Each structure stands twice: as C-alpha cells, then as structure tokens.
Amino acid sequence: MADISNKKVSELTSEEIIQLIANSKKKTIVRVYVSGNLKALDIRDFEGYGKEFEFVGGQDFGVLFGNYEYIKEILRNNSITSFKVEYIAHNSAIPLSDISKFNARIEPGAIIREYVEIGNNAVIMMGAVINLGAIIGEGTMIDMNTVIGARARIGKYCHIGAGSVIAGVVEPPSAQPVIIEDNVVIGANAVILEGVRVGEHSVVAAGAVVVEDVPPYTVVAGVPAKVIKKVDEKTISKTQLIEELRKLR
C-alpha cells in the first residue's frame, strides 16, 4: 500500500481508505480500574507503555487506558489484587480523532473518527457522527444526531440539520461522494444519497430525501426531493445563519 501519511483527507481515494481499514492493526481499547500493591509493580516498565496504553494512579489504586493486548499482561501480575475492565472498542480498525487539533466547537458526545478535516469555527453538536474521509468546511454547523458518512464533502458556512444523514461511500470504490457546496441549509432529518451534489446557497427542506443533484440557489422538498422554488428574500430570512454561534471566544 502506498504511503498516505502526508496526504490530505481530500486526496484519499476509496481504494486507499479501504486498504487503510483492511491493513490497520485491529485494537480492543479498554479502561481498567486496578487495585493492589502497585508500588511493587512498575507499570512503566511493561511493553507498550506510553504508546499502546497509559496509567494514572498511585501506590494502591489506578486506571489503565489503551490496548487490551498489552494491558492484559499487567493484569496477570500477582501485585494486582482486583480489577474491573470497561470495553470502549472491540477490534477497532480506525480510532477516534484527537479533537484537540481542531479549531472548532465540538460538544460532548460527538463521535469523530480519524482522517477527518474540520474547518475553523465549525460547530459539531451532541451526538453527531463524522466518519473517516469526511470534510467539514469553515463555519459549518453539524447539528445534533446528524450522520456524516465517509468521504462526504461539506462546504463553508452550511447548516446540516438535526438527525440528517449525509450518505457515505467507501464501497463500491467507484461510487462518488456527496458534495455539499458553500452556504447550504439542510433541514432536520433530511437524507442526501450517495453521489449527489447540492449547489451553493440552496435549501433542502426537513425530511426530504435527495436522490439527484440540487441546482444552486434552489429550494427542494419531498420524497424524492424536487425543486419547489428559487431561493428568495423570504427563504434567506428564514434560513439565516447566526455568526455568534460560531465564535470560539
């Protein structure tokens, strides 16, 4: 497999994402509470410490976090008198992203996988799920419980309504991703299917199922979604984005 470490997310192909998942070392991630004579057990000497797992604690109680393949060796030690294992992920291929690297507002409960790009001042609300290969533009809000599928491209200053589904494409590898251009508003519980392009400044009504491209500056609604009118002053006033919601300070 070709080296993709220096590639931007936008440059990753379906084939590369498939190989990334297939070839990744699957990990079972756990949180383990341990008690015992930890003073006699130098956990930092165990293989994988600092890279595969971490430890926080004192002389008689602590918490291990990381790859269970390495942590289970510690649990076999006689110095450990009791422990409790909490499973976070099982045979996981792609980890969650380190959200501290994003200059965005990310609320508790959002699930963001690695290999995702999030623009400055974007807002990711509670329960939103963003899959690998997705791109979220500057100032865009992903509302509560929205699903952004693999390789979806969402432009700048969009609002993706609560409960919406932006379809992802990894397989078949020939499938084209969803592209949502700048300044688009998508209503709650709308569904945008694979390969659809939603043109700039357009509006997708709540509950719509979009199966074909949406021209710029149009409003679509229904199942399947159809153009019902051009964006007008009334539409603009009803779908206006609030800049203050995107400020980080």
From Swiss-Prot:
Note the superkingdom of the native organism.
Bacteria
Q: PROSITE patterns, per this entry?
A: HEXAPEP_TRANSFERASES
- Give the catalysed reaction(s), semicolon-separated: (S)-2,3,4,5-tetrahydrodipicolinate + acetyl-CoA + H2O = L-2-acetamido-6-oxoheptanedioate + CoA
The record's keywords, sorted A to Z, are: Acyltransferase, Amino-acid biosynthesis, Diaminopimelate biosynthesis, Lysine biosynthesis, Repeat, Transferase
Which molecular function terms from Gene Ontology are attached?
A: tetrahydrodipicolinate N-acetyltransferase activity
Q: Name one GO biological process term.
A: lysine biosynthetic process via diaminopimelate
Q: Does the keyword NAD apply?
A: no
Q: What InterPro entries is this protein classified in? A: DapH, DapH_N, Hexapep, Hexapep_transf_CS, Trans_hexapeptide_repeat, Trimer_LpxA-like_sf
- According to the record, the signal peptide region is none
Q: A single Pfam family, by name?
A: Hexapep_2
**Is the Transferase keyword given for this protein?**
yes
Annotated pathway, please?
Amino-acid biosynthesis; L-lysine biosynthesis via DAP pathway; LL-2,6-diaminopimelate from (S)-tetrahydrodipicolinate (acetylase route): step 1/3
Q: Which SUPFAM superfamilies match?
A: Trimeric LpxA-like enzymes
Entry EC number(s): 2.3.1.89
User: Which NCBIfam families does this one have?
Assistant: DapD_Ac (TIGR03532)
**UniProt record similarity statement:** Belongs to the transferase hexapeptide repeat family. DapH subfamily.
HAMAP family to which the protein is assigned, alphabetical: DapH
Query: Do you know which PANTHER family this protein is assigned to?
Result: 2,3,4,5-TETRAHYDROPYRIDINE-2,6-DICARBOXYLATE N-ACETYLTRANSFERASE, ACETYLTRANSFERASE
Q: What does this protein do?
A: Catalyzes the transfer of an acetyl group from acetyl-CoA to tetrahydrodipicolinate.
Q: What is this protein called?
A: 2,3,4,5-tetrahydropyridine-2,6-dicarboxylate N-acetyltransferase
Q: From what organism does this protein derive?
A: Fervidobacterium nodosum (strain ATCC 35602 / DSM 5306 / Rt17-B1)
Corresponding gene?
A: dapH
